[in-house]
Amino acid sequence: MLGAYAEGHDLHTLTAQSLTGREEIGKDDRKLAKAVNFGLLYGMGAKGLQVYALKSYGVRMSLEEAALYRRRFFETYPGLKRWHDNQRRVWQRGQTETRTLTGRRRLDVEKLTDRLNTPVQGTGADGLKLALALMWERRSECPEAVPVLVCHDEVVVECNAEQAANVRSWLERAMVEGMDVVLNRTDEVDVPVEVEVRIARSWGESG
């Protein structure tokens, strides 16, 4: 998976190709891949994937298909499988503490899915908070920018239309640098960080 990121591959496309066995991928294939990527990342079994795919993406699959997709997913990303197996062993030994990449602790973790979720989503949250801190520190560079909303991994900033390009660059730098500090804390890995910044008249239009 790290190799795919480093080479600039789109993970949803890569997963879809693995699941379907086809090079040419359509819109429905990407929906399937998103369900599999986001579902299995946090430890779902075949039944959980079947329910999640239908509820969250409108993707129908049989239990047999869900099991097949699960097997192909971990064949495609063996490093993730090794990490899951390691976390499962730690969980089975009764370890109830887990941490994000920055070292932020979460205690009393009873479910395996929570143990898998926290290092991923928690690390993303740490990166976002660092990005917000950078925006504050650099507010003099872009005084016309007014942050108005943070939702999951999104930051909504208001400004005049003529300042939009400048604000876009300012926001993008902060987001990339904030996450880069979190992901690339050692020389062992070099994870490229990419963000998408859209200019629109409303949050609804940006989607």
Language model features by range: what are they?
Residues M1-G207:
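Conserved catalytic core of nucleotide polymerization and phosphodiester-bond processing enzymes
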